[in-house]
C-alpha cells in the first residue's frame, strides 16, 4: 500500500509512545490497531526507522525478543515526542479537511 508522506513516521512514533519495541512488534501493532487495514513492508519500515533515528526522533539498542532472539529495539526520544505532537495535530487537520471535501462523517463501524 502507498502511504502519504509522513504517514509511516507518525504511525511508528505513535506505536513507540507505548514503549520500546523491535521492528516486527512495531509492524504487528500497526496492523492490529488498524484492524488489518494497514501494513508495512519490511523495506519501508526499516527505511523509516533509520531515517527517524538519524533525525534524533528515536534511538535503538540491541536486546532479546520475546522468543530469545537478538533484535534491535527502538524507543522514542524527547525530540520524537515533540515530533509526534506536531504530526498528530497536522494529521488531525488533514483528516478533517479530507472528510469535509468528501462530505463524510466519522462513524465507528461494527
Regions found by a protein language model. Name each.
Residues 53-70, 75:
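Beta-hairpin "wing" of winged helix-turn-helix
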Residues 2-44:
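N-terminal helix-turn-helix DNA-binding core of bacterial DNA-binding proteins
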Amino acid at each position: 500500500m502507498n502511504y502519504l508522506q509522513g504517514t509511516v513516521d507518525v504511525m511508528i512514533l505513535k506505536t513507540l509512545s507505548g514503549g520500546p519495541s523491535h521492528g516486527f512488534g512495531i509492524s504487528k501493532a500497526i496492523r492490529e490497531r488498524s484492524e488489518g487495514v494497514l501494513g508495512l513492508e519490511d523495506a519501508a519500515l526499516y527505511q523509516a526507522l533509520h531515517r527517524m533515528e538519524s533525525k534524533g526522533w528515536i534511538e535503538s539498542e540491541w536486546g532479546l525478543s520475546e522468543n530469545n532472539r537478538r533484535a534491535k529495539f527502538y524507543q522514542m526520544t524527547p525530540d520524537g515526542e515533540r515530533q509526534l505532537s506536531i504530526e498528530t495535530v497536522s494529521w488531525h487537520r488533514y483528516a478533517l479537511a479530507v472528510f469535509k471535501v468528501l462530505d463524510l462523517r466519522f462513524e465507528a463501524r461494527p
